Regions:
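RNA pseudouridine synthases
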Residues: 2-169
Length: 169
């Protein structure tokens, strides 16, 4: 997602690229995010949906509890787990782990659960709190393409998201 901050991974060789693609395909990559959502979530949860492109709104996904697709739509399974990190008056800060990798997965699933991401105009409407959605790719754990050891990369929250949390505290 364009406005999502945080980690992006790149490979320097074709072999490393192939190894990373395999890890993503086999769901061996641990992808961790931080999200600020509107409302108060349960302490933890697991969201399981089938996501499809919304034919009525270009660039948006829709969530369904079953794999039955509307005509011309291809449902993709999405699994998201979250744990509450901090509660604010009208918002909740979450640590999120995705087990799959579908476009807009976190944004769409949290909105479908009734907890849209703060600042997310596509899935949550207007939010005066910030100019972009509060979703940050905080950590990524992979197997090194050559050495095979597990490596964890982390990215701290950027200044605008830290400032948003300071305003809420």
């Amino acid at each position: 997602d364009t406005d999502t901050s945080g980690l992006v991974i790149a490979a320097r060789t074709d072999e490393a690229y192939a190894a990373l693609r395999r890890q993503f395909r086999e769901r061996k990559v641990l992808k961790e995010y931080v999200a600020l959502v509107r409302g108060r979530t349960p302490e933890h949860g697991k969201l399981e949906h089938y996501l499809m492109h919304n034919p009525a709104r270009r660039g948006q996904m829709i969530a369904s509890s079953n794999a039955t697709a509307r005509k011309g739509l291809r449902p993709m399974r999405a699994i998201t787990q979250y744990r509450r990190a901090r509660i604010f008056e009208e918002y909740t800060l979450l640590n999120v782990v995705i087990r799959t990798g579908v476009t807009h997965q976190i944004r769409c699933q949290l909105a479908a659960a009734g907890f849209p991401i703060a600042g997310d105009k596509l899935y949550g409407g207007e939010d005066p709190l910030l100019a972009r959605h509060f979703l940050h790719a905080a950590a990524l754990t992979i197997e090194h393409p050559v050495g095979k050891e597990r490596i964890r990369f982390e990215a701290p929250l950027p200044p605008d998201l830290r400032q948003t949390l300071a305003l809420l505290a």
